[in-house]
Design a protein with these regions (language model features):
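N-terminal Sec-dependent export signals
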Residues: 1-2, 20-26
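N-terminal alpha-helical modules
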Residues: 23-146
Length: 146
């Protein structure tokens, strides 16, 4: 009986000790904490690679959500044949794409602003800013798609 209790306590301790970031997955990279993710690298080179990796995952996730948003728009207009709806779907899709392009330019500009001036931490400042902006946009897209 004592062994079972000790075993259960050990298992519970392991569960509680797992970092929260493990709850994230590549299919939902926005759940990763960029600081924890980047710090998996042992040196600046590895940290930069981790930053690029997370940025790539976040970009792919954002692109996927934008495609879903466009599909949602198409489904919303499906079967609407009245004259007042002619051309409206195309306008909406152009607006979605334009918003996304503008948003991407903003995220890039904000990250470049953090990078300005250089220094040893400039690259990491760029990626911190960029990844946090991507996470912000992903959360926004997820709310819209609910």
């Amino acid at each position: 009986m004592v062994n079972r209790i000790q075993s259960s306590l050990g298992f519970l301790t392991i569960l509680l000790a797992l970092p929260i970031s493990l709850l994230a997955s590549p299919s939902e990279p926005e759940r990763y904490d960029p600081v924890e993710y980047f710090n998996q690298g042992a040196n600046t080179y590895e940290m930069t690679n981790k930053a690029k990796e997370l940025a790539g995952l976040l970009e792919a996730r954002m692109e996927h959500l934008v495609k879903l948003k466009i599909e949602d728009a198409k489904n919303s207009y499906k079967g609407l044949t009245e004259d007042r709806f002619k051309g409206e779907l195309e306008k909406l899709i152009k607006l979605i794409i334009s918003t996304q392009e503008t948003w991407e330019a903003y995220a890039e500009a904000a990250a470049k602003e953090e990078h300005h001036g250089g220094g040893s931490g400039a690259v990491m400042r760029y990626y911190y800013s960029y990844c946090y902006k991507l996470i912000e946009r992903i959360k926004e897209l997820k709310i819209i798609l609910k």
